């Protein structure tokens, strides 16, 4: 689950973090990785990551370490993404599903880590053209990684609903899925004896 954070600036620069602004108007030298620029992580982003980790019962890491994930994609102007891999801001934790209309269950978390978002490709209808809006590039994200224990689409939906309520309650994200503030990537893992 990717959670876009409600911050005034981007994760590693003072560029504006706003939704719906004129395309490519909130992109500065650090976001573009111009020579001589150095990223500096936002304290506000760190605080939000710790707040969510504590709320989910995880263990907060004492040292922040960031990695470069290198890949080429048109909406990634630097050619790499700054993320956390081996040393996430939070390890473990649990999303507790407690509702009257279904059995109670827990979804265990592997980690919560900080990273920057990529830009946005906008495919122009009825043409072969794709436009790029790099305003989203560098926007702070929390990525929540669960253990492979979600057994159904219903459980996935309940987990996402609980996370959405929590990030809104903690005021770290508006959780607006329509605007991309809360995004979900599913990976299907099946047992060898039970394919799909």
Please give the residue ranges for each predicted region:
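Basic, nucleic-acid-interacting segments
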Residues: 2-185, 190, 194
